[in-house]
């Protein structure tokens, strides 16, 4: 099976990133074709297991000129909290991730999409590709962050 794993955060840098990487490794051992789409800082690389295709979305770049988004108030790297994003930042995020997502879907044609965190990117993936099987992983930090947002 062709499987795409998606996260807006750096893989391997946080608990959810380590979880994503371990799921990718386990599924690769089962013979599945793996692709990962992830947000990273410009100038960084995605270190994925052998045979796994990596599609980075670069933060701190012209199209996405702020640090990688994070699901916790304090991340192990410089980050942007979702609740601090402006409307302009949200549009930049959407455009940058959908451009790479469209490329991945066209090139890799995943049969299954695994999205990490029940937040904005998972919603974008589901909305853009309603015909695809999309599963969302909740790592609990997303629920905690939702409680801190003012909905007035």
Predicted feature residues:
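A conserved catalytic-core segment of Leloir-type glycosyltransferases
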Residues: 39-107
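Conserved small/polar residues in nucleotide/adenosyl-binding loops
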Residues: 152
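Short, flexible loop segments at the rims of nucleotide/cofactor-binding pockets, characterized by
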Residues: 12-13, 88-93, 143-149
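Short, well-ordered alpha-helical microsegments
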Residues: 43-45, 120-124
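N-terminal subdomain of nucleotide-sugar transferases
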Residues: 1-58, 108
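Short N-terminal targeting/anchoring amphipathic segment
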Residues: 101-119
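Short amphipathic alpha-helical segments
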Residues: 48-49, 125-127, 149
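Active-site proximal beta-strand in glycosyltransferases
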Residues: 112-115, 125-145
